[in-house]
Each structure stands twice: as C-alpha cells, then as structure tokens.
Regions:
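Residue-level signal for secondary-structure boundary elements
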Residues: 31-35, 89-96, 122-123
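Generic structural motif
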Residues: 64-66, 122-123
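Acidic, low-complexity, intrinsically disordered interaction modules
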Residues: 73-75, 79-84, 90-98
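Acidic, proline/glycine-rich low-complexity IDRs
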Residues: 99-125
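Alpha-helix boundary/N-cap detector
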Residues: 10, 14-18, 22, 68, ...
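Eukaryotic, polar/proline-rich low-complexity intrinsically disordered regions
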Residues: 60-61, 68, 80, 84
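Long, contiguous N-terminal structural blocks used for assembly/anchoring
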Residues: 1-64
C-alpha cells in the first residue's frame, strides 16, 4: 500500500517576549561557541542587547573563527523561526505547540539553530 503526504501550512504567533527569550538563550550560551561578540547597531532599543531584535533593531554577530560579521534583524529572525518549524528542528522539545511558541522549551541548542537559520538559512556550526 502507498503512503501519501499533504503539505500543511499554519500561522504561528511569535510575541516580542518570545523573541527576547530566544535571543537571551542564544546570547547567553547558545551561539557563544561560534560568535564571540554581539554588537548593538545604533542605540539600545531595550535594556539589554537581547531585546534589540524584537524592537526592530539590528545586532552584529562576530564570527569567532572567521573574520566575518553577520547582521541579524527582525525579518531574518522570523525567517529563522519559520525554517526551524518547517524542518522540525528540535520538534521533540515541543517548543512550537500548534500556533504559538513555548519558549520555556527553548534551550541554548534550539536558540543556536534558530539564529543560524536566521543568518545562513542552514545550520553550519555544531
């Protein structure tokens, strides 16, 4: 008997708090093995660098192995979330339940993958 597959589209709500939580996990351990510096572009839009993206700002992420600097924006970040969900990265962590995120289940590894997908559309480190 043959198996058949259908493509399902869904809309997932991502709050500013979700973004801040994921960025905090990324900057406080998730990306530190490949990124040695996160630099706020312009003025701080929140109290911490982790709050920059949710407020429409930009972070420059400095590669610790290459002489490269990558710019992370809200648009790129949301694309990273989309790719992580579409490709079922860490789906067993239940960080995306139905139509919203559960950032209590986003650890440093999940945050790292989201940031890499945001910047490179692929996971190239780790």
């Amino acid at each position: 008997m043959n198996d058949f597959f259908v493509n399902i589209e869904r809309t997932v709500k991502v709050t500013a708090e979700d973004i801040d939580d994921i960025m905090c996990s990324a900057l406080e351990g998730g990306i530190n093995y490949w990124c040695n510096k996160a630099e706020v572009v312009g003025k701080y839009l929140g109290e911490y660098a982790s709050e920059q993206i949710s407020r429409g700002g930009t972070l420059k992420l400095h590669d610790s192995e290459e002489d490269e600097v990558y710019e992370l924006t809200l648009e790129k970040f949301l694309k990273g979330i989309q790719l992580a969900i579409q490709h079922n990265y860490y789906a067993d962590y239940d960080w995306c339940n139905g139509n919203e995120l559960d950032t209590c289940n986003v650890d440093a590894s999940v945050a790292d993958v989201i940031i890499q997908l945001s910047l490179f559309s692929d996971v190239i480190y780790g």
